[in-house]
């Protein structure tokens, strides 16, 4: 009877997480998830650093453009949808967690991110580069079942990143000032299991759903006989995209652990690592 009740709770958690995800309106820079179970007892804290590298294809849709010639409005129109290929993002976070209830944990992260992509807007070997910009995230973890060497649970997290930088190309003989600003909010919902493999090593993984929304704003100045300035804006809105993740947790010392992790979806690959202390 107890086993049946635990299984029912697992299915209810999965259904609740999916329902929350489908109802989210602002939901890309995939973030590290870690084990999908609560790691902290009630009242405990954790703190540490996280690093994530992600590579993905980013669809830009519903584009709009405004063109100005010699400082005066010239015209506007619809811009075709495009795909930013191999959009690479590096993030570095300071993360803090807290055991809010038994088997429930909340966490926040704050740090910096930078991103690059190339040859996707004009196919003229142009590249986007930026300095590190602000990134923030938060989430919840819950443990639903504990038995033998197994734990089963779920995770919900949201990350927001804003990137701005210049676009340039070695093929442009005349300087063409171009700037882009990318703002994305991504949401991940996962269920999964954690297995204690040895006294110090655990493995974890499972399926997850991913959602993304945001904007891609682009401004250029074309230096010809006239002085043209263009302002382009696209929307980013994808999901749910389904994928899987696999990771390992290593107990380095008492109350100190490290995680390494890989995530994969149809259009993204993610590698992550962290080191956390529990207090």
Task: Describe each model-derived feature in a short phrase.
Residues 83-109, 116, 182, 194, ...:
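Outer-membrane beta-barrel transmembrane strands
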Residues 86, 238-240, 259-274:
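Solvent-exposed loop/turn segments connecting transmembrane beta-strands
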């Amino acid at each position: 009877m107890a086993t049946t009740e635990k299984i029912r709770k697992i299915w209810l958690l999965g259904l609740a997480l999916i329902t929350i995800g489908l109802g989210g309106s602002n939901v890309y820079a995939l973030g590290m998830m870690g084990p999908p179970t609560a790691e902290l007892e009630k009242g405990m804290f954790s703190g540490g650093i996280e690093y994530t590298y992600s590579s993905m294809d980013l669809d830009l849709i519903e584009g709009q453009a405004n063109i100005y010639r010699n400082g005066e409005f010239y015209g506007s129109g619809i811009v075709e949808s495009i795909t930013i290929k191999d959009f690479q993002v590096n993030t570095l976070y300071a993360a803090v967690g807290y055991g809010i209830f038994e088997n429930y944990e909340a966490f926040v992260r704050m740090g910096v991110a930078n991103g690059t992509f190339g040859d996707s807007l004009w196919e003229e070997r142009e590249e986007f580069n930026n300095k590190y910009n602000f990134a923030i995230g938060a989430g919840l973890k819950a443990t639903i079942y504990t038995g033998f060497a197994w734990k089963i649970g779920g995770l919900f997290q949201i990350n927001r990143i804003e990137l701005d930088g210049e676009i340039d190309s070695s093929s442009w003989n005349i300087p063409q000032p171009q700037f882009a600003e990318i703002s994305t909010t991504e949401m991940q919902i996962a269920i999964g299991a954690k297995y204690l493999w040895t006294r110090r090593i655990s493995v974890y993984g499972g399926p997850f759903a991913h959602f993304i929304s945001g904007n891609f704003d682009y401004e250029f100045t074309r230096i010809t006989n006239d002085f043209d300035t263009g302002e382009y804006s696209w929307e980013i809105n994808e999901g749910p995209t389904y994928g899987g993740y696999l990771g390992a947790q290593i107990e380095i010392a008492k109350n100190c652990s490290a995680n390494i992790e890989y995530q994969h979806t149809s259009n993204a690959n993610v590698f992550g690592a962290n080191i956390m202390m529990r207090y």
